[in-house]
Amino acid sequence: RLGDGAGSGKVVAPENSLTPENDLAAEKVVAAENGAQSLTLQYLRGERPRYSRSKRTPNYFIKVEGAMEHNLKDIDVAFPLNTLTVVTGVSGSGKSSLVGDILYRAMFRHLNETGEAPGTFRALSGSLDRISQVEYVDQNPIGRSSRSNAVTYLKIYDDIRKLLSEQPYAKMNGYGPAHFSFNQEGGRCPECQGDGFVRIGMQFMADVTMTCEACGGKRFKPDILEVRYRGCNVDDILNMSVSEAIDFFSSDDNPSAQRITARLKTLVDVGLSYIKLGQSSSTLSGGESQRIKLAYYLSMTQNRDSVRPERILFIFDEPTTGLHFYDVEKLLRSFDVLLSKGHSIVVVEHNPDVIRAADWVLDLGPDAGDNGGELVFAGTPEELVAQGNTFTAKYL
């Protein structure tokens, strides 16, 4: 087992621990020798309490009437607003058909009068006027270009370029923010065009990528790399981890540096303190991409001037995929920030910790395929457990 903390890369339990009992025992010994127990061990032994949310009571709903897409059996489903609603059920019970194919597409068409046709249903009703935007936060890459990364997606790089352009050497040579862009001619390496690598086409094999010989993988011209902000050039900054960059920028009172720090902290909030600022989006996992998108919306809530008056309906499809127990806590805290701003969240999820933390549960079933497609429960997690006759209830 690896730990302790994101980006550490330390082995805290040996690979020859073949049983759960041995694994836990070995990990405890190793962790004790290091002066602390690993987070994994604390969660598995029940020594660390699960995150406890302040539950919200639903007052307004959006109702999907007559949902009949795929195996859905003409069901009416009410989705609460300004709450964390978790849609549960065994695989194949109809969750994605209901939430992705019907709710999301129907809401998008209602709000934008365009978009992909929703799945089969009769009507959309309820407090539709209380939602002015719908966002499906999926695990698709955050950008199609190899030059896209977390700081470009969160608009952090704009302030980084501005800071660099304000340095004496940059002013002396007439370098503006555009000279520190990957996407514009001027400062980027002309050989690799800001990628830091070149791609060599192979006729009968996959293309090969090699570090750009002209810039040595640094992406920019030598003169641009001479510009330094607090001793670091643009390449140094892009190679910092999120946590390193927060330490670096937070001690500067410059408004741009403070904005950078605030937005970087949203990446920490979603468990991404370890990624490099300039790390290409093509190297990020689907779960990491999804959490960067969540961080973007969290950053919108920081500055009142940037927060639009809309109340957004956020839809997530299994956001805990690949997450440690500790990261699930961070995810739930991030959800609470969005809810506190008046937004609404619907999550398709199997993770018991998320289901327990929900304000409202919509359980589909009772089984999969032709034996699924029914709404077998709607209510709080506590009511679901008390009812006790669905697969989800039994596992909770």
Label each residue range with its predicted role.
Residues R1-L396:
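Conserved phosphate-binding elements of NTP-dependent enzyme cores
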